[in-house]
Amino acid sequence: EPDIRAKLDMMQASRVPLERCSGYSYRFNAPPCDMSKAWLTEEEYNEALRRWSSNVDVSRQALQEGNIALSLRTGLVDPNVPQRQTNLIVDPPNGLLPALTPEGKRLALQMGSDWALPGEDLTFDGPEDFDNWDRCITRGLPSSMMPYRYNGGFFIEQAPGYVIFRLEMIHEARIIPTTDVEELPPEIKQYLGHSRGRWEGTTLVVETTNFKATNPLLNLAVVGAPPGNRFPSSEQLKVTERVVRLNDDTWLYEITAEDPVILTAPFTVRYPMRHNPDYLMPEYACHEGNTIVRYYTETSRYERANPTPEPEQAPVAVSADVAKALNGRWVGRPRIVTVDLDIELEFTDNGDNTVNAKLIGTTLGEINKPLRDLTIDGRVVRFTLPNIDPWRFQGELTADGTLQGIVASAQGSLPVTFRPLKRK
């Protein structure tokens, strides 16, 4: 059998967003991203390398000065080297995730997670309100095999007739037979499914079925993944992986996910990894003592039993024409492939060149809380949605009567256009 043993590091591709022009590519008033661009030019790639090297130098100097926090910023501990590809998805060719089926979107809205969607008011009453990654059970597939920003060790080991994929995150191991062995009956389901391998020349091909329908297909450890960790899977999920050793230093990895219950089409991710013979795989403790689920639940119950009054929103001074244009209800839908999430706002013209505003609610339920940190500078509007995971909006009241901008949080940033819904 071909020798593909290696100590690989997924973090080397962790700067590459999942979708083309996604994640941190969105900025308010930034130049539009080129959706046709799958690869950086030589000049662009060299400039990305220059900026990355400069950040590494800053991190190295910080480490020498004893500033541990600053030294961990980039490149020194996690070698997230710029890549030439602009996105991880190579199929569909547009570099975007396929749309979810109606059933997929219905299931997405039922999923639990400790990551809030824009405007969502999360509550926790038990383990079922969290996903499997929150609970340190598994990231599932294909999530486990996506490049992410920390604990990215991926060791490939071999024995006669077997290949072992050993992962640093969640310290999982997949033992993959490459010869004919007895198949699992279809009624037996596993978190990471049932894998079978075969060789096509020097390429290892692994097909995996028999999944438990409890894992998100993707999660937020991947730059540019859909927010909220609401990406369901079904028992009909099938994952196909291809691994080939290109030379002594570089391995090419590809993974395809198809799930007719959830996805309207399959999608494929491909990226290179470098072999690092000195890579040490430390213990992955997840959250120490597995206490986070209990703490979240206890805190959520306490906060609901003892609600903190919302601070009063001071009226915000604006011009008369802006007050008139904003007055009324607005609805916007950020681009989130997994859910159709409508966000409804209400601005009130106080009649004295000031306005107030609140979040009426979202598709997930009514909120009726004042917008936080509301500022209006000319026609530029900024505010924070009042929920557990702060989402900050920055946009502009346009000449065509819409409110266009970006809503962003630690999960990434999303373009959104709010349109008038009901005039007062």
Residue ranges and their predicted role:
Residues 385:
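Residues on the solvent-exposed faces and adjacent turns
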Residues 374, 395-397:
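Extended lipid/amphipathic-ligand handling interfaces
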Residues 392-393, 402-404:
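Alpha-helical, heptad-rich or low-complexity scaffold/stalk segments
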Residues 350-356:
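Beta-strand repeat architectures
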Residues 1-344, 356-358, 362-368, 380, ...:
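PEST-like low-complexity, intrinsically disordered acidic/proline/serine-rich tracts
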Residues 247, 351, 399-401:
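Residue-level recognition of beta-strand termini and adjacent short loop/turns
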